[in-house]
């Protein structure tokens, strides 16, 4: 019987619906549609890029407790009620959350550049001091290059699991030479080179 009265009360045209039911019937988050949030988020990012993030943070206490403060938080995945409650109870925490998330968004935008520069510098290895250096390749015509299998007895073959060096009997003659010795130089004995000092 009590349920009928509630349903009759809702069905009456003359009675205005209760405020809680009215809130449930209408979308109270309609102001936060994606079309409205995107321009605000873009505006926030433009301010961050221009260095005017401080101005946005200074204006925060005026906006604390309103739904318009939510897009400035940078898309935190908490429900809107939790953010609003946090902002209402502690404006300092809300401004800290805005600054943290704003800088987090800015840092995420910079991440691909940082990762690409660090990976290119770390891939150089031990000889990465001069990035213009080309990797030396085997000639393919000398006797060690023509050998197809490892010997299995040299130190490089025995340490195959830990070391990454080629078999000593398969190492190219060109690679045995140091890169700077490709020019023909006559060897000079050390005593004769400094004979004019004595």
Curated annotation (Swiss-Prot):
Location comes to: Cytoplasm
Zinc finger motifs (CXXC-type), residue ranges: 132-173
Where are the stretches annotated Interaction with DVL1? 161-166
Region described as Disordered: spans on this chain: 114-134
Instruction: Fetch the InterPro entries from UniProt.
Output: CXXC4/CXXC5, Znf_CXXC
Q: Which positions bind Zn(2+) 2? A: 151, 154, 157, 167
Give a Pfam family name.
zf-CXXC
| Protein role | Acts as a negative regulator of the Wnt signaling pathway via its interaction with DVL1. Binds preferentially to DNA containing cytidine-phosphate-guanosine (CpG) dinucleotides over CpH (H=A, T, and C), hemimethylated-CpG and hemimethylated-hydroxymethyl-CpG.
Q: Per the record, what about its domains?
A: The CXXC zinc finger mediates binding to CpG-DNA.
Q: What is this protein called?
A: CXXC-type zinc finger protein 4
Tell me the organism: Homo sapiens
């Amino acid at each position: 019987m009590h349920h009928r009265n509630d349903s009759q009360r809702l069905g009456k045209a003359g009675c205005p619906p209760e405020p809680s039911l009215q809130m449930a019937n209408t979308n109270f988050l309609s102001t936060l549609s994606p079309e409205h949030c995107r321009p605000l988020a873009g505006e926030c990012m433009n301010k961050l890029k221009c260095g005017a993030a401080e101005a946005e943070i200074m204006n925060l206490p005026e906006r604390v407790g309103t739904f318009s403060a939510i897009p400035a938080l940078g898309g935190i995945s908490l429900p809107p009620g939790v953010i609003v409650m946090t902002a209402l109870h502690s404006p300092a925490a809300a401004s800290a959350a805005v600054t943290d998330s704003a800088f987090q968004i800015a840092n995420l935008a910079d991440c691909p550049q940082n990762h690409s520069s660090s990976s290119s510098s770390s891939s150089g290895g031990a000889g990465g001091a001069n990035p213009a250096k080309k990797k030396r390749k085997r000639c393919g015509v000398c006797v060690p290059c023509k050998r197809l299998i490892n010997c299995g007895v040299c130190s490089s073959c025995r340490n195959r699991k830990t070391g990454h060096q080629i078999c000593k009997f398969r190492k190219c003659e060109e690679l045995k030479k140091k890169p700077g010795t490709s020019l023909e130089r006559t060897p000079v004995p050390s005593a004769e080179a400094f004979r004019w000092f004595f």
